[in-house]
A protein has these predicted regions:
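Asparagine-centered strand-capping/turn motif at beta-strand->loop junctions
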Residues: 53-56
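Short beta-strand and strand-turn-strand segments in soluble, beta-rich domains
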Residues: 83-93
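Short aromatic-acidic-glycine turn motif
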Residues: 70-80
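Extracellular/periplasmic metallocenter environments
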Residues: 58-59, 97-141
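C-terminal motif of bacterial Sec signal peptides marking the signal peptidase cleavage site
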Residues: 19-22
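Beta-strand signatures of extracellular beta-sandwich domains
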Residues: 63-67
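N-terminal edge beta-strand
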Residues: 25-49
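Bacterial N-terminal signal peptides that target proteins for export
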Residues: 1-10
Length: 141
């Protein structure tokens, strides 16, 4: 009788654990380096997503900025200084985090299905990080 209860308990545990772990947020690792954004995934399911952002640069602060947009990643609207116009046509600013060199931060967001672009919008001594290729397209399904 004890072994039957144990088997039933074990079977319930095996069935419940995947359901509970599927309920948590999607986690995506992001590495920022000199003029580069690398992500462990470029798509995710709609819902809660936590981006674990690490700045691998040794001397530059970077931003991780999320825009919802249908524009190509390399064609976002620019302001007079050459940075992305965060209120420009065709882009909706979602959220952002600034990460000092060698540091890490988490950015938790709830994203509906759609197209997104992640960028660094830092202007460092008239060097626009976005213009140097610091962007990554991202799709939420």
């Amino acid at each position: 009788m004890k072994s039957r209860k144990l088997l039933i308990s074990l079977a319930l545990f095996i069935l419940i654990v995947p359901v509970l772990t599927a309920c948590g947020p999607t986690k995506i690792d992001v590495a920022l380096s000199t003029y580069k954004i690398e992500m462990s995934a470029t798509s995710a399911k709609a819902g809660d997503i936590v981006f674990h952002v690490h700045n691998d640069a040794t001397d530059l602060t970077h931003e991780f900025v999320i825009f919802r947009t249908d524009l190509p990643a390399d064609q976002l609207p620019l302001n007079d200084e050459g940075a992305v116009d965060e209120e420009g046509p065709g882009v909706t600013h979602v959220d952002e985090v600034e990460v000092e060199a060698g540091q890490a931060a988490d950015l938790a967001v709830n994203l509906p299905a759609g197209n997104y672009v992640m960028i660094c919008n830092i202007n460092d001594n008239n060097e626009q990080h976005y213009m140097h290729g610091m962007y990554q397209a991202f799709t939420v399904k």
